[in-house]
Amino acid sequence: MAEKFDYVNKIWDIADYVRDTLSQAEYNKLVLPFVLLRRLENALEDTREDVLKALNEHETDWGLDNDNYCNASKRSFYNLSNFRLKTLGAIDTLNNFMAYINAFSPNVREIFENFDLENTATKLNKAGKLYEVCKKFGSFDFSPEAVSDRDMSDIYEHLIEKYGEAIAEGAEDFMTPKDIVRLAVGMIFANDDEIMNNDTGIVRTLCDPTAGTCGFITDALDLLEEWHKDKQMKAPAKIVPYGQECEGQSWAMGKVNLLLRNVAAKGKDKYDKRNDLSQHILLANTLTDDKFENMYFDYQLSNPPYGKKWEKEKDSVQEEAELGFKGRFGAGLPSISDGSMLFLQHVVAKMKPADEGGAKAGIVLSASPLFNGDPGSGPSTIRRWLFEKDIIDCIVKLGSGLFFRTSINTYLWILNNNKPNERKGKIQLIDASDIKTSMRKNRGKKNCEISEDQIAWIIKTYVDGHDHGKSVIVPVEDFMYRRVTTQRPLRMHMVIPESFEFKDDLPYLSQEGKNLVYGVVAKYIGDNPYKSALQLSKELKTTLAYTIDKLPKRQKSFFTPKNIVKWLFNNFGVIDSSYEAVDLKGNPIPENELRSYILINPQNIITDSNLRDYEDIPWDTDFDEYMQKEVLPFTPDAWIDKTDTDEKGSMPDHKIGTVGTKISFNQYFHNYEAPKSPIEIAKEIIQLEKELQSFEADFLK
């Protein structure tokens, strides 16, 4: 019957009716709460008289806010009013409407508060339209008999897509498409025999820290029911949902989704309808306010916003990061421009420990967390921490065009802190970027979907651990490397001509001091280049001692022999590759002895900072072998600076080179495209020239 109900056009008629009263940006504040209100009203209709009877008999003892009324409503919510949307009356409509809303149980009232329903109703009432709007919504049949839970969920999804532009504004995507949800849910439940087949009533927890409208949670529950449906179990596994959402209207939608769960199940309901599945869906910012502190979950699902800044949460996040691994963000902090790796760390922190059975999680991320950040940076160290914890089980590259509000490629990360032995120390990469089906009609930017068969193929590839053209299983070390610094000797001669000017002055000196410098430098015209620099630096410091002594401490510290030599080279040095390298005393090092000198005493060679370079050496690769093969054939006077060690980030090992991490799908799934032939390119150039000539002719007419 739900398919016959043309809710899109009928609700659009109502939006059109109020267009002079509410702006288009406010339609969501009308459409969404009124649809939810009508669904609640329909769900309570059968037990309304029982609730009013309980109120009459027990109001003195129970008051108005008491869960005992749920025994009469047979739901996890209730309403103590005689009103319906169709019976509010044309006179005093606003007061009657608010009395009706305030007669709901507290868990429903807080939902409507976050929709700012009273303000919307007041605007409609002032325009004389509230009564008609209530009557129109009151005529819709959203009863459990007419609209199933799944159909109602579809209605919500379409309404959010059409009217929910203002919800979670600024987030790239607050609603995860169902095909992505079903894939993620299928992957975290895969190979879990207890959740699929246990008939002893086990209870498992599922949390979404970026709950949005609770699409992940509701579809996880739907899938579990589908799988259990044909098994005729007496006590199948039960999921208790938890979640947090910081945007009020998204939270309200998600809260209602779970509050109304199974209202259409009748006698086949596998849950106690008086059990409020929405009770653990809380309104709070996950990054700044962990509502489930010291709690750990069996499963987690999350689709955090892509590229969303976390500057508003900065103080709170940094404060927790200072706790190290006693907090949620001990591994490191990502760039302020994208907080998705904070959510990734949060999910890991909330996984049930392996010694208690372990946990699995699915989180949808953009490409950035795979490779962003230099070695030692926050993002790189976060990945390193995940590798060392051996918690990444699989990453699936999804195709473009799968989400409603972004066309970028996304990646589904599957986390598991209790991997089977054969998968320990490894990560499976699945390239599903072309595993999708075109849709007949676009929904926003979503023009493709993953079919049920395609979802099954991806899950089977994951479960079986297939290593084929679309899947590889790789040791975590393949995603790690060390960035080492390479140095080369300074090859320079210093020319002090008979007539000279300084290119730059020694800082902080008075004119008198600069004149002293000029006089000292003039005495060294034509001397040995390096020895002159060393002798000059000493004499300058002696000559300027009185002047320098008068300077503030911070300025005084500039005048070291090293800085003065650098200043001399900046003014008089000439790079010349034909010159020999020299040691710190200015002695030349014969070219045939340079390599031996480098191996024995490289720290005594004057280096050229302009030739300093970096090499990313794969993990466990011998440094000397790498240099012999990749560097020395091209720069035979280079060496690795062994003083540059791994000191950055939250887990330094103090070894040579800074540890870096990156996960590159292109390394394993690169599709080679042969370049165009010269003949084909020549034809294209000729065609472009003809088009250009034609354009010029038309332009000059």
Language model features by range: what are they?
Residues 134-135, 164, 233-236, 274-282, ...:
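Short acidic (Asp/Glu) and glycine-rich catalytic loops that position anionic groups and cofactors
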Residues 404-504:
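Flexible, glycine-/basic-rich loop-and-beta segments that form/coincide
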